[in-house]
From Swiss-Prot:
PANTHER family: DEHYDRODOLICHYL DIPHOSPHATE SYNTHASE 7-RELATED, DEHYDRODOLICHYL DIPHOSPHATE SYNTHASE FAMILY MEMBER. It is an enzyme of class 2 (transferase). CDD domains: Cis_IPPS (cd00475). This is Dehydrodolichyl diphosphate synthase 8. The keyword DNA-binding does not apply. Belongs to the UPP synthase family. Pathway: Protein modification; protein glycosylation. Its cofactor is Mg(2+). GO terms for cellular component: cytoplasm. It comes from Arabidopsis thaliana. The lineage of its organism: Eukaryota, Viridiplantae, Streptophyta, Embryophyta, Tracheophyta.
Amino acid sequence: MNNTREEVGEFTQIFNALMSLMRKFIFKVLRVGPIPTNISFIMDGNRRFAKKRNLEGLDAGHRAGFISVKYILQYCKEIGVPYVTLYAFGMDNFKRGPEEVKCVMDLMLEKVELTIDQAVSGNMNGVRIIFAGDLNSLNERFRAATKKLMELTEENRDLIVVVCVAYSTSVEIVHAVRDSCVRKSKTGDGSSALELSDIEECMYTSVVPVPDLVVRTGGGDRLSNFMTWQTSRALLHRTEALWPELGLWHLVWAILKFQRMQDYLQKKKKLH
């Protein structure tokens, strides 16, 4: 019995080593072409995944989704993508049943606090976490946890991850316009008109470059009120794969599509 376990363990180690080598080769080939500066993910399909797999519990699909987050971030880091934006919880999601909302938010808090422990132990592998959205609408414990995690990881630079929580473009624009007006009034420049740059500087996501590739899982064609201002020149890639099903090859295919469309995307940028 012990020999069997040892053999399984050795096989697992060999398999993982081979997979790591394969990824390194694939990513080296990918890096011959342009790599997106910021990939944004609209993580759709957790509930459908749970239903498809007959998983029990309101948070079952979302727990599976968190596993995908871990792997996708690792792949992006290995490829050399400097920024990743995750649409974790939109303002419209608060319209779901109160029991489900509480379940998802509790799970998210659990993962944030677990990541805090990792950051304290120095196990973040150079990943910086930034939370963006109407964080004031969240409970005090959640806000405190997000603030602490951002502080603990603010010096990390290998991969910068923006997690959009309590987020919608509509709310973001209202917030940005209001803050822009307040800034101008405080500087005594309230008489001048607002410039586009004034508003963009006050956006929740202004700390990172705008996305140049948006990946939506679950077969949807909509942006669902996610960064519609910032993604006007981005490539939208949709996949039928549900978020917990998203894997290495889905990501590689999305980046290859981005590379094939590069001439078109550059022409669009020059028009703005």
